[in-house]
Amino acid sequence: MKSGPGIQAAIDLTAGAAGGTACVLTGQPFDTIKVKMQTFPDLYKGLTDCFLKTYAQVGLRGFYKGTGPALMAYVAENSVLFMCYGFCQQFVRKVAGMDKQAKLSDLQTAAAGSFASAFAALALCPTELVKCRLQTMYEMEMSGKIAKSHNTIWSVVKGILKKDGPLGFYHGLSSTLLQEVPGYFFFFGGYELSRSFFASGRSKDELGPVHLMLSGGVAGICLWLVVFPVDCIKSRIQVLSMYGKQAGFIGTLLSVVRNEGIVALYSGLKATMIRAIPANGALFVAYEYSRKMMMKQLEAY
């Protein structure tokens, strides 16, 4: 069966959803630690301290707070990201005056990923907001910033709708865009350059799961080294806007640097770097293999 644009988009969307699911299931505990340290750096001395205190306060389940929204966030983001990635590759070919079937360079592929991330940000922002608030609910309650409440997905969603209406789900959208667009240039660039390195003259499609895992890990590290300070500001805006009007990106950035120093922008970086290899490796292994499987099934008809 011939693969039309609609069928190809559906395959990319489904494979992206599989990748997003694998990413969350692999890296959620470290993501929780990252968000806690970004939002409340004064409460924790480091990664180990945050881990031990979280376990002592709320047990193992504390590391999986926000897993539901995280699954929704990453499945939504990666579904849209990889679906639009195919369209954006065609856009890059058109701009570069290339044939529709021409192979893109690694840098051109990175540019396509960057364009696709702008669309993914619109799907990511609402679910990321709910996830971050759930992950830091304990700290918000203990610091007296909010009253004790039922910290469930539905209670957070109702709180956002009641306080800010539907647009409240887009607190931190500008920060998300500032993070996603440049970040995914380095994400896809790092992934494709790593695959080219491991392929060593062979086709990239011949790479096995270990090399795909390592390439995904490099992609994640490239992404987070570039955008981590922006992600820190995004987390602050999304969490702290829960109890009052929060300054925008520039205002929050200046406040953090002035009151806590530049180092505060990198609080939680270690947890993110540890998470990057297994989580992003799992993302690309799941994406590549599920996509190959669906393409084979399509060709069999």
Curated annotation (Swiss-Prot):
Organism: Homo sapiens
Key words of the record: Antiport, Membrane, Mitochondrion, Mitochondrion inner membrane, Repeat, Transmembrane, Transmembrane helix, Transport
Transmembrane domains' residue ranges: 5-25, 68-88, 110-130, 168-188, 210-230, 237-257
Chain's role: Mitochondrial transporter of the positively charged amino acids ornithine, lysine and arginine, and the neutral amino acid citrulline. In addition, transports the basic amino acids histidine, homoarginine, and asymmetric dimethylarginine (aDMA), but not symmetric DMA, and the D-forms of lysine, arginine, ornithine and histidine. Functions by both counter-exchange and uniport mechanisms.
Upper lineage: Eukaryota, Metazoa, Chordata, Craniata, Vertebrata
Compartments in which it is found: Mitochondrion membrane; Mitochondrion inner membrane
Keyword rRNA-binding among record annotations: no
Main location (coarse class): mitochondrion
Name of the protein in question: Mitochondrial ornithine transporter 2
UniProt record similarity statement: Belongs to the mitochondrial carrier (TC 2.A.29) family.
Effect of Y74N: Does not significantly change the substrate specificity
Gene: SLC25A2
Activity regulation (record text): Inhibited by pyridoxal 5'-phosphate, N-ethylmaleimide, spermine and spermidine.
